[in-house]
């Protein structure tokens, strides 16, 4: 079974927890470290329950707290090369420390985190290399779509087979 819960959605910050089995991932983290910890606590979770952070794109409402959270808790950060390139310049001397936590991903190339199979897929948006995700576990599929400039045939094709 796949479980999910929003930590928040809007211009002040975005974050979504997706879990299957004992593993959970955080998609985007647009909140401060303390804010993220509090939001997770409301779900009965802590950052120690997370296996990884996945990043959709480099806009601050999705990225603001990613690298602070990742460094504090030693979490790998999965993001596209384009997103890393856009984010790297904002790290002001911390890029080398953060780079070690980064795991490059490509749109339409599945990877596994815990019990979740993750499929990033490209979407139109005003960012370098934005993606959204389909999560699979135990024969079920959950699609997520947040910032998307327009619904394309590709987006429809990717999300149509999803259960939710």
Predicted regions and their residues:
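Short, hinge-like loop/turn segments at secondary-structure boundaries
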Residues: 44-45, 94-99, 162
């Amino acid at each position: 079974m796949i479980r999910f819960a929003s930590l928040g959605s809007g211009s002040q910050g975005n974050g979504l927890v997706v879990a299957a089995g004992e593993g959970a991932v955080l998609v985007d983290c647009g909140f401060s470290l303390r804010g993220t910890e509090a939001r997770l606590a409301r779900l009965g979770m802590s950052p120690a329950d997370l296996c990884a952070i996945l990043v959709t794109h480099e806009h601050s409402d999705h990225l603001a707290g990613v690298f602070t959270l990742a460094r504090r808790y030693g979490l790998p950060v999965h993001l596209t090369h384009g997103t890393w390139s856009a984010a790297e310049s904002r790290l002001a001397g911390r890029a080398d420390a953060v780079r070690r936590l980064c795991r490059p991903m490509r749109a339409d190339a599945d990877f596994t985190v815990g019990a979740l199979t993750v499929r990033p897929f490209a979407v139109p948006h005003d960012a370098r290399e934005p993606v959204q995700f389909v999560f699979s576990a135990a024969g079920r599929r959950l699609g997520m779509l947040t910032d998307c400039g327009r619904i394309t045939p590709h987006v429809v094709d990717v999300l149509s087979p999803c259960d939710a």
